[in-house]
């Protein structure tokens, strides 16, 4: 199966964002004046090249031969049996295997697209932020492939949790800059990357790793990941001659979920379910359930739901998963929540750890801790369902990077 071009097959989706970069009341550009010309330049370049045959041909060839797309749509037979009713009915569970991409996650779809764009814009220096390290690894990988200078900002706490990915980035020639400010996690790394971009905007392109940030990033990152949903549609039609009933994905910033959801936003019969990190519980102070518990505010250049205190100050997020440990969320997810098109729930660290083990033991697939949150929600979802609906879960990444973290919790010290 070949990958398909970026243009979505659901034309009315093109109505969001509007020309101001807004998804309803969310999104926009809340940035220093210094960055406005750079964002305008980026949007102009993106609109020019997204339909350019040469750009598309190069992107599709690299997605196929370098990344390894299309990724399989895998029927999880033993996971399905685990949730089956005594009469044999129950949800039919499929995994969209983004973990099989080069670098082990969905992140490379976007990193590759943005580097090809940066090259055409004449930028020789690339910066990025990373939490779990997968976006950093993907960016370092593509920069190595094209011989570009690469600087990755990563919180010191995340560097400890993801030491293997830090080594991978450095192995491929990237400079990894530790961020000690704040909680030393993804929010702080993003803030530091934006500061760098303000200072070096003439020579540097900032590859934001999620569907967050100022316009055009939420739109652009979504579009580079839309290949996930496009392949899923074709594979579902090929496998059973129809569409799925439910799509399920974890949500931190929300790029893997938007990549899967976007193709199906206008298919009103399909439930779109995002799963956030409840950490130690949504009624504690240690969680990252932004859409469940947040209020509207501005962070990193966009209006969206945020975790805030009574004074409107952004508060610390917590998750066992470094990739979900973020107090904001992409503005399109906020929009989909407000218009009632998508549903958002949360699972705890403990539930995610159990799901991490469950998928490993039942299917021989070790998922990323981020992905494990989506897997964990099956415990709640499956007993609620009638008949045998088809569920597709975005297996957004592999769990090699998390084995050390998980071992600390599961092996008595």
UniProtKB/Swiss-Prot annotation:
The modification N6-(pyridoxal phosphate)lysine is found at residue 107. The keyword Protease does not apply. It comes from the Bacteria. It catalyses: (1S,2R)-1-C-(indol-3-yl)glycerol 3-phosphate + L-serine = D-glyceraldehyde 3-phosphate + L-tryptophan + H2O. It is an enzyme of class 4 (lyase). Gene3D superfamilies: 3.40.50.1100. Keywords: Amino-acid biosynthesis, Aromatic amino acid biosynthesis, Lyase, Pyridoxal phosphate, Tryptophan biosynthesis. One of its GO terms (molecular function) is tryptophan synthase activity. Its EC number is 4.2.1.20. CDD domains: Trp-synth_B. Its cofactor is pyridoxal 5'-phosphate. InterPro entries: Trp_synth_b_CS (IPR006653), Trp_synth_beta (IPR006654), Trp_synth_beta/beta-like (IPR023026), TrpB-like_PALP (IPR001926), TrpB-like_PALP_sf (IPR036052). Belongs to the TrpB family. The beta subunit is responsible for the synthesis of L-tryptophan from indole and L-serine. HAMAP family: Trp_synth_beta (MF_00133). NCBIfam families: trpB (TIGR00263). This is Tryptophan synthase beta chain. It comes from Trichormus variabilis (strain ATCC 29413 / PCC 7937). The gene is trpB.
């Amino acid at each position: 199966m070949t990958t398909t071009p970026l243009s979505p097959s659901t034309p009315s989706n093109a109505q969001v964002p509007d020309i101001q970069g807004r998804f309803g009341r969310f999104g926009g550009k809340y940035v220093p004046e210094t960055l406005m010309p750079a964002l305008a330049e980026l949007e102009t370049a993106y609109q020019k090249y997204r339909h350019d045959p040469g750009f598309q041909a190069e992107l599709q060839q690299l997605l196929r031969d370098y990344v390894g797309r299309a990724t399989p749509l895998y029927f999880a037979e033993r996971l399905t049996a685990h949730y089956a009713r005594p009469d044999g009915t129950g949800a039919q569970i499929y995994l969209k295997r983004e973990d099989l991409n080069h670098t082990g996650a969905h992140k490379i779809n976007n990193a590759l697209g943005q580097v090809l764009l940066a090259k055409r814009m004449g930028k020789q220096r690339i910066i990025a932020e990373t939490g779990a390290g997968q976006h950093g690894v993907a960016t370092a990988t593509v920069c190595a492939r094209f011989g570009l200078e690469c600087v990755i900002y990563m919180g010191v706490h995340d560097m400890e949790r993801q030491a293997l990915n830090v080594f991978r980035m450095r192995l491929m020639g990237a400079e990894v800059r530790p961020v000690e400010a704040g909680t030393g996690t993804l929010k702080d790394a993003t803030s530091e990357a934006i500061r760098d971009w303000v200072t070096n905007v003439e020579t540097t392109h900032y590859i934001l790793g999620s569907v967050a940030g100022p316009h055009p990033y939420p739109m652009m990152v979504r579009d580079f990941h839309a290949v996930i949903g496009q392949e899923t549609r074709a594979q579902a039609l090929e496998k059973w001659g129809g569409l799925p009933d439910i799509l399920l994905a974890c949500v931190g910033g929300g790029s893997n979920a938007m990549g899967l959801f976007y193709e199906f936003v206008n298919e009103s019969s399909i439930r779109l379910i995002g799963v956030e990190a409840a950490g130690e519980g949504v009624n504690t102070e240690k969680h990252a359930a932004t859409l469940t518990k947040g209020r509207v505010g501005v962070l990193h250049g966009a209006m969206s739901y945020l975790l805030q205190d009574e004074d409107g100050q952004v508060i610390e997020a917590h998750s066992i998963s470094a990739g979900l440990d973020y107090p904001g969320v992409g503005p399109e997810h906020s929009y989909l929540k407000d218009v009632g098109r998508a549903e958002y729930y949360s699972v705890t660290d403990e539930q995610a750890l159990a799901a991490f083990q469950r998928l490993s033991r039942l299917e021989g697939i070790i998922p990323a801790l981020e992905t494990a949150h989506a897997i964990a929600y099956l415990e709640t979802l499956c007993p609620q369902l009638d008949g045998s609906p088809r569920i597709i879960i975005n297996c957004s990444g592999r769990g090699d990077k998390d084995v050390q973290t998980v071992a600390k919790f599961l092996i008595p010290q």
